[in-house]
């Protein structure tokens, strides 16, 4: 009799466990249910990293460097633009735009590929297009690094490396040193580009974040041209080395 009672108790427990498991397995297999973790959401951001007046030793300029992206944690579409417009003289200027697909390939690192368009305007008017491949990420010690390789519509090969670092004096007062190096494998005279290292720019900007999304800044910038690029600049009566004081805004949304 005691044995029968034990058997009944075990059968009752087993049926109860099966009853609990059934709805759980049904929940996991139910199509159309949301993911347990929201890792497929779409996010977006627009960042104007530099919008600045630059008091050069030659002609003063208005310059910008901005980017925007939309996508998830792994795949994103990036848009980038940068340029400079002279505020006096012939009102010469230049700008570029990039449209890139970005894929997360390692923690803090994205592989990027897409297209780039360049335009010179003013006394000279030229344009050209590129295919782009590169990376964006954080190097050791939290340096933001963006190396990229460009192949123009004429088969000209060039490269660019950007790097920056943020040093926090307080949660709102931030010093940002930056570096940009441009190089080319071929000479392209209409764009004033020689083969080898074209130019190096070093910058130092101090910003104060009134809000996280809005920060005025001041700083300095030093640019130097090299090799064939410097020779072309001299032949056009341009400076090969320039020191500038900058003031501008950084904002995002």
What are these regions (language model features)?
Residues 27-88, 102-103, 245:
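Outer-membrane beta-barrel initiation region
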Residues 42-44, 60-64, 91-95, 127-131, ...:
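Residues that define the transmembrane beta-barrel architecture of outer-membrane proteins
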Residues 50, 79-83, 113-117, 147-151, ...:
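Transmembrane beta-barrel strands of outer-membrane/channel proteins
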Residues 66, 97-99, 133, 161-163, ...:
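Membrane-embedded beta-strands of outer-membrane beta-barrel proteins
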Residues 70-72, 103, 137, 151, ...:
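Residue-level signature of outer-membrane beta-barrel architecture
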Residues 74-79, 107-111, 141-145, 170-175, ...:
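Repeated loop/turn-to-beta-strand initiation elements of outer-membrane beta-barrel proteins
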Residues 124, 128-188:
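Detector for outer-membrane/organellar transmembrane beta-barrel domains
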Residues 203-204, 208-209, 213, 239-253:
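Outer-membrane beta-barrel "beta-signal"
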């Amino acid at each position: 009799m005691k044995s029968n009672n034990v058997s009944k108790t075990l059968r009752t427990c087993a049926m109860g466990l099966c009853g609990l498991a059934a709805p759980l397995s049904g929940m996991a297999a139910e199509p159309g249910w949301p993911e347990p973790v929201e890792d497929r959401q779409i996010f977006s951001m627009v960042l104007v990293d530099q919008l600045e007046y630059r008091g050069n030793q030659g002609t003063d300029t208005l310059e910008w460097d901005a980017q925007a992206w939309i996508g998830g944690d792994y795949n994103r579409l990036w848009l980038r633009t940068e340029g400079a417009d002279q505020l006096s003289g012939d009102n010469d200027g230049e700008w570029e735009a990039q449209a890139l697909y970005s894929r997360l390939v390692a923690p803090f690192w994205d592989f990027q590929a897409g297209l780039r368009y360049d335009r010179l305007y003013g006394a000279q008017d030229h344009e050209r297009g590129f295919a782009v491949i590169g990376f964006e990420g954080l190097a050791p010690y939290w340096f933001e690094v963006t190396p990229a390789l460009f192949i123009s519509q004429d088969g000209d090969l060039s490269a660019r490396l950007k790097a920056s670092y943020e040093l926090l004096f307080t949660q709102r007062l931030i010093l940002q040193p930056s570096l940009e190096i441009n190089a080319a494998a071929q000479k392209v005279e209409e764009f004033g580009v020689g083969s080898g290292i074209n130019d190096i720019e070093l910058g130092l900007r101090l910003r104060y974040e009134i809000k996280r999304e809005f920060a005025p800044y001041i700083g300095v910038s030093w640019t130097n041209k090299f090799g064939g690029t410097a020779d072309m600049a001299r032949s056009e009566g341009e400076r090969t080395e320039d020191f500038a004081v900058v003031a501008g805004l950084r904002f995002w949304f």
